[in-house]
Amino acid sequence: MQPSETIRYHGLDVLRASAMLLGLVFHAPILYYIPEIADGFKDLGISKDTMPEMELWVSVIAQWIHSWRMPVFFLISGFFSALVLHRNGLVYFLKDRFVRIGLTLIIFASLMDILDGNPTGKLNHFWFLYYLLIITALFVLTVSFGRNSAAYHLAQGLLASMQRRSGLIPFAAVMILARIICDFIDGGTVKIPTTYFDIKLGGLMYYTVWFFAGAGLFARIAILEILCQPRTLIMLGTAAMFVFPFHHAYADGFFGHLRDPDIGFGDTLMGSFFAAATTFLWSLFALGITHKFVTRGHAIITWLVELSYPVYLFHLP
């Protein structure tokens, strides 16, 4: 099944917008899971030493959002990157990405870095644009020069198998293994950069995998129809709800913050496995459910989609 030249993927638009806006919810309790930020408010009597422990219900919501939000964002970014390249060609794609990602990163990350009174090249919450810029460059190189590589043909074979529901099993195995490897590269869990020179290889590799999975999804668009079948949604949703409590029990902070330095190898491995499984299941469930039920445009949907990106950029974590 070839992608349509004119079809609009409203469900994916809504999912991407939701992922952006949920970032505001995720960042709301940021002083709890990155308590060192609280030290910037010592004049107000707030510091990491005075921060109480995060309540369970807040932790559950934050971990649930954290488990799938950014992987889904990079997945959809890969999908729409492949779509724009397919419909408009390489020159348009490069210009579009330079404006949407490159200029946005330079302007807004620099502005926030300057406004805090200590400009040191900090990325703050714009780290995802920095990684997206790097990954997009890798994507262009792969499309231009990598089509004859063994990795490319292996990925095509994996995607071909996913045109059946049973094909989700090898896909899950690859994504879970990728997460475990990337976690250990970054010292136990994937991390994010704080400055332009602070690239975390595991995190970059992990989000690259999700981006290329999204690009592959566009190439094998029939997979979307499998994901939104009722039987598939029930299977993914049930498994996702079953696995999440284990993920929450083994979760050890956020992006490495609050991580217990004495955690053992076994607990690290189990935590990585459950994190990977939770991410995979919730991401595909969200993809399938939105594609199934959001099938047409609406003024509210358009407003939500157009508003989500600038709101996320301008909010202060």
Where in the sequence are the language-model features?
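Alpha-helical transmembrane segments and their immediate juxtamembrane cytosolic regions
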Residues: 1-317
